[in-house]
């Protein structure tokens, strides 16, 4: 994801959760989810291991999300549409939602479509509740929706690509 980890870790350490969350969400479209289920490969190569133990980056991200995400999300105002282009994103998994979020933040209309009734794909349908609470998924979905991303869920999987191309860029 290429996040600004040193910045948000420092802010969480100072108890500045709102500021830390703003840094996180600038690059990460699913902060509550990744704060819960990231497999934290970085811990095994952390330079802090030379001194004591690795920095618990995932836990710090989750702390910021739990303490600041609802407030941040409530204050979101969708970006002004600055493009006459309209994007259709096929697939409402985490990657599709991230794509839509960043397009929408940058002033383009974005519509996420999926044959399933609920977004987030594997996150929603495969990962069990004891690993990832539905509340964390809800937080990230609300973040995407509040930014102005539209959803068309439960679509017929036999739709016409040609018809789609006429309506979207």
Please provide the spans of the model-predicted regions.
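Ferredoxin-type iron-sulfur electron-transfer modules and their immediate structural context
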Residues: 1-86
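Beta1-alpha1 glycine-rich phosphate/pyrophosphate-binding loop at the start
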Residues: 2-14, 19-24, 54-58, 90-158, ...
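Short secondary-structure capping/turn micro-motifs that flank functional sites
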Residues: 28, 40, 119-120, 159-161
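Glycine-rich dinucleotide-binding loop and its adjacent helix/turn
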Residues: 63-81, 139-155, 161
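Short coil/turn segments at beta-strand junctions that form active-site/ligand-binding loops
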Residues: 85, 108, 169
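Core beta-strand elements of the Rossmann-like FAD/NAD(P) dinucleotide-binding domain
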Residues: 163-169
């Amino acid at each position: 994801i290429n996040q600004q980890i040193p910045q948000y870790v420092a802010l969480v350490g100072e108890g500045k959760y709102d500021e830390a969350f703003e840094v996180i969400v600038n690059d990460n479209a699913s902060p509550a989810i990744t704060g819960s289920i990231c497999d934290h490969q970085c811990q095994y190569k952390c330079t802090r291991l030379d001194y004591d133990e690795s920095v618990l980056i995932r836990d710090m991200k989750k702390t910021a999300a739990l303490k600041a995400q609802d407030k941040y999300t409530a204050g979101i105002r969708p970006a002004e549409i600055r493009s006459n282009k309209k994007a259709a994103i096929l697939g409402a998994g985490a990657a599709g939602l991230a794509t839509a979020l960043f397009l929408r933040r940058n002033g383009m209309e974005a519509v996420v479509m999926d044959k399933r009734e609920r977004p987030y794909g594997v996150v929603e349908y495969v990962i069990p509740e004891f690993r990832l609470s539905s509340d964390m998924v809800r937080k990230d979905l609300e973040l995407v929706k509040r930014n102005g991303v539209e959803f068309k869920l439960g679509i017929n999987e036999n739709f016409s690509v040609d018809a789609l191309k006429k309506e979207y860029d």
